[in-house]
């Protein structure tokens, strides 16, 4: 009788752990989407400055882009794909529009650190892929700058 009860208890514990793990996975996707949205919001004014010719923001924009891409890479490795990722990102952007600026700044700082840590923990190939993609993105943004020609 106790063996049967022990098996039931073990089965309940396993089911509970599996449900908790599934819930944690969903939460982590939401967290990653929130981070990507926060980093994108932080990067947008820098990208605008770079497009207008201000090269002084290029290094900072590259770091933000690398952090965002690293977080996207982890979400992809965990099975998140485009349709669901886009939906989570849209939701995160909407939520962040109503966040007080200090809370958004804190989220952005935490997410940048998290992205940097993900990149530091990545293997050489993963780091290469993320940094190369980020460099290409920032280069494309910089190339959108059209120098102002003066009439002389």
Q: What residue spans do the PLM features occupy?
A:
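Bacterial N-terminal signal peptides that target proteins for export
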Residues: 2-11
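Compact alpha-helical subdomains of small soluble proteins
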Residues: 69-152
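Sec/Tat signal peptide C-region and signal peptidase I cleavage site
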Residues: 20-26
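General secretory precursor processing signal
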Residues: 15-16, 38, 114
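Hydrophobic helical h-region of N-terminal Sec-dependent signal peptides
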Residues: 11-15, 19
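Short N-proximal segments of mature Sec-exported proteins
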Residues: 27-79
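Secretory pathway export signals and precursors
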Residues: 8-9, 31, 107
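The N-terminal extracellular segments of secreted preproproteins, especially immediately downstream
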Residues: 11-12, 34, 110
